[in-house]
Amino acid sequence: MMTTMRRHATTLALFAASTTAVTAVVNMLTEPTISHQAMLQQKMLLDQVVPAELYNSDIQKECYVVTNPALGSSAPHRVFIARQNGEPVAAALESTAPDGYSGAIRLLVGADFHGKVLGVRVTEHHETPGLGDKIEVRISDWITRFNGLMVQGEHDARWAVKKEGGMFDQFTGATITPRAVINSVKRSALYLQTLPPQINTLSACGENQ
């Protein structure tokens, strides 16, 4: 009986070892593909907020980590720098609207360094379906209204919903959500105006992590 038990134990051990080996090989083979797909998806998102024709650098390779209250939280946010012939011309900045109706709204804001917004996309939110979710480009084109708009200083009153004297449509039954996004985009564009002199001092993405 002991011989039989040993045989079963050996079989199980061999099976476990072979399964582990197969899993390791599969992971090794699929990891590059998954990583490549993630990079492609990231590039597609970046292209939606910073048009590719504006720069000739590899925007994905120039990524920095920034922290600033203007970005909506104390957490680190990433910023991707776009350069034309070596000169920084625009950036895609991760930002947070902390005051959404159902919690924080994560954004990717593209802008030049003179206050012009190039594009905005929502990357994560928990807003109410049918109301606040109109910030998603797959549901509404509302988020594209930011394209090409200028932020003319911190006190630019146009950056508000129309019912508060601004130039942006609010949603029927939902004002908090668009207000939160508008304010976050405005703060992000203003922050990016201050960024160029700091670029050489920023920590690259992946450093000290």
Swiss-Prot record:
Keywords: Cell inner membrane, Cell membrane, Electron transport, Flavoprotein, FMN, Membrane, Phosphoprotein, Translocase, Transmembrane, Transmembrane helix, Transport
Modified-residue entries (FMN phosphoryl threonine), positions: T175
PANTHER family, A to Z: ION-TRANSLOCATING OXIDOREDUCTASE COMPLEX SUBUNIT G
Places the protein is found: Cell inner membrane
GO cellular component: a single term: plasma membrane
HAMAP family: RsxG_RnfG
Pfam families documented for this protein: FMN_bind
Superkingdom field: Bacteria
Task of the protein: Part of a membrane-bound complex that couples electron transfer with translocation of ions across the membrane.
Essential cofactor(s): FMN
GO BP: electron transport chain
Classification via InterPro entries: FMN-bd, Ion_transpt_RnfG/RsxG
Protein name according to UniProt: Ion-translocating oxidoreductase complex subunit G
Its EC number(s): 7.-.-.-
MF terms (GO), sorted A to Z: electron transfer activity; FMN binding
Membrane-crossing segments per the record: 9-29
Membrane topology, from the record: Single-pass membrane protein
Family: Belongs to the RnfG family.
Subunit: The complex is composed of six subunits: RnfA, RnfB, RnfC, RnfD, RnfE and RnfG.
Major localization class: membrane
Keyword set includes Isomerase: no
